[in-house]
């Protein structure tokens, strides 16, 4: 979700009593420095089950021009990304693969009917690109088919963000809806034989807290999301909630280690390996003065590097967090 949409609610820090340990195991790594992660905005990683292809969103700094990119792993490194075959014309963002890799979901302002006007929406007196949920199907030759609009109540309105798909087809997403409170909440649309049921809000606590960008475990045992539960280190941090024996969600826990920072962390997604977590963050390198004197060329080069305050992609390992809550695969 765009930083413009992060209308976060301040609160009193709360103490979280949870068996989260092994903080040293959650140090992250920048994904594809200068290839994937650049001086532009990159967010919303979606990695294929084989681990050899990465889809992500790249945009200008204001995130008014979003495009879905694709990169293939070559020789152990991510190759130069290209515009995905189904993107490049509309405001397309936030790709998410189904666990089996056969569908790729994304949000877009493209018109629902051919020849129509692009979607727009308004919030807090600001007008911006609207979004509905779309998907593409994997074809027998490995390519993607034409984008398909997801019909039904799930796409009511034009503020659907960051889809995440469970193994049974249930779709989690964030949205601003009549029961969202002042900002955003997380919803789930259950897949049925008749299509998708009306979305239900995921009960994670007081709706005065802003919650967005869900990343659902394929078996729906846990949910990672971005927000501020009162103890955020920055404008938004990442939290995890575990499914309880009675089916309800447990108290959200602030993820440990270096996953969160005083910067913005959001748009989490789960990789194909156990415990693999991709995160978008605008954390940056510190600049100390006096610095080595720049000339025009070195200044331009340095300012175009990742970690310049733009959002980049990071990869973390939360396997120990999951094991501490009885999940080992």
Residue ranges and their predicted role:
Residues 1-9:
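Bacterial N-terminal signal peptides that target proteins for export
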Residues 19-23:
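Signal peptide processing junction and immediate N-terminal pro/mature segment
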Residues 9-18:
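Bacterial N-terminal signal peptides
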Residues 24-329:
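Short, conserved micro-motifs composed of acidic
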